[in-house]
From Swiss-Prot:
Catalyzed reaction equations: UDP-4-deoxy-4-formamido-beta-L-arabinose + di-trans,octa-cis-undecaprenyl phosphate = 4-deoxy-4-formamido-alpha-L-arabinopyranosyl di-trans,octa-cis-undecaprenyl phosphate + UDP
Naturally occurring in which organism (per UniProt): Escherichia coli (strain K12)
Localisation: Cell inner membrane
Gene Ontology molecular function, alphabetical: phosphotransferase activity, for other substituted phosphate groups; undecaprenyl-phosphate 4-deoxy-4-formamido-L-arabinose transferase activity
Segments on the Periplasmic face: 257-269
Pfam families: Glycos_transf_2
Protein name: Undecaprenyl-phosphate 4-deoxy-4-formamido-L-arabinose transferase
Superkingdom: Bacteria
Induction info: Induced by BasR.
Record function comment: Catalyzes the transfer of 4-deoxy-4-formamido-L-arabinose from UDP to undecaprenyl phosphate. The modified arabinose is attached to lipid A and is required for resistance to polymyxin and cationic antimicrobial peptides.
Keywords per UniProt: Antibiotic resistance, Cell inner membrane, Cell membrane, Glycosyltransferase, Lipid A biosynthesis, Lipid biosynthesis, Lipid metabolism, Lipopolysaccharide biosynthesis, Membrane, Transferase, Transmembrane, Transmembrane helix
Bilayer topology annotation: Multi-pass membrane protein
Length: 322
């Protein structure tokens, strides 16, 4: 029987990218939610290379009187999950909660996650109820969730929702993983002994626009396929075997037909030969592209470059920059 340790301090990690309109409300509501916990807390806001006034607003928030905000400024945009990992490396709490800055997932749900974690869960996930996203975003999210469930075997309902709670030992385990392509909810479930999901509200986006464009969603799909499993490589081998057997069968058939109907028929079968040839060429290019994705990720990981660079950290207890 494992001993369940009560949560003493909560760290809220929020990546920020061009969210100057939502920041004042985000800080106010998140602070209010954390105050209601009756526990120690800190709010880590990571500026992911914003081009608007977000970084300056974060610095001011950290330097305000009685502030609980830690501002982490990255030198450029590294992506949502890399920014969250940067926040993980600076947390001091024993329960870490991640939250998006767009306020579509209400900060008021934080106490519910803390209460569920106090029951002994390593990871507390969430499922968005009555999603207020476009049809395209909903469809893409369903496809990604199904892909993850098939490749990992983990029956979690909503991997795309970043409102989640992680015990400190789960975060420490994730920080020991150095691959560049990181999808935090999946990585956390690899190390979690006990995980659960709870339903949460989902609101319309009041400020700005979603940072996930069509191309970024496509890139996310590639990341998930190549960083989660080697199943596509096995499928590629199976496909190659099927094509090879099919090609050999067609070759035997063509020889038989030529012997049966004579060389005149063979001339009339030129277009079929071209069709078969182009099928093989297309399959080869698909295989080469897939192998290239894996090799490219191996090359990126072997170089061992840092996944982010922290330019500055501003803590409320000290006005000095780290």
């Amino acid at each position: 029987m494992f001993e369940i340790h009560p949560v003493k301090k909560v760290s809220v990690v929020i990546p920020v990218y061009n969210e100057q309109e939502s920041l004042p409300e985000l800080i106010r509501r998140t602070t209010t939610a954390c105050e209601s916990l009756g526990k120690e807390y800190e709010i880590l806001l990571i500026d992911d290379g914003s081009s608007d006034n977000s970084a300056h607003m974060l610095v001011e928030a950290s330097q305000a009187e009685n502030s609980h905000i830690v501002s982490i400024l990255l030198n450029r945009n590294y992506g949502q999950h890399s920014a969250i990992m940067a926040g993980f490396s600076h947390v001091t709490g024993d329960l870490i909660i991640t939250l998006d800055a767009d306020l579509q997932n209400p900060p008021e749900e934080i106490p519910r996650l803390v209460a569920k974690a106090d029951e002994g869960y390593d990871v507390v996930g969430t499922v968005r109820q009555n999603r207020q996203d476009s049809w395209f975003r909903k469809t893409a999210s369903k496809m990604i969730n199904r892909l993850i469930q098939r490749t990992t075997g983990k029956a979690m309902g909503d991997y795309g929702c970043m409102l989640r709670a992680y015990r400190r030992h789960i975060v420490d385990a994730m920080l020991h993983c150095h691959e560049r392509s990181t999808f935090i909810p999946i990585l956390a479930n690899i190390f979690a002994r006990r995980a659960i999901e709870i339903p949460v509200h989902h609101a319309e986006r009041e400020f700005g626009e979603s940072k996930y464009s069509f191309m970024r969603l496509i890139n996310l799909m590639y990341d998930l396929v190549t960083c989660l499993t080697t199943t596509p490589l096995r499928m590629l081998s199976l496909l190659g075997s099927i094509i090879a057997i099919g090609g050999f069968s067609i070759a035997v058939l063509l020889v038989i037909l030529r012997l049966t109907f004579g060389p005149q028929w063979a001339a009339e079968g030129v277009f079929m030969l071209f069709a078969v040839l182009f099928t093989f060429i297309g399959a080869q290019f698909i295989g080469m592209g897939l192998l290239g994705e894996y090799i490219g990720r191996i090359y990126t990981d072997v170089r061992a470059r840092p996944r982010y660079f922290v330019q500055q950290v501003i803590r409320p207890s000290s006005k000095e920059n780290e």
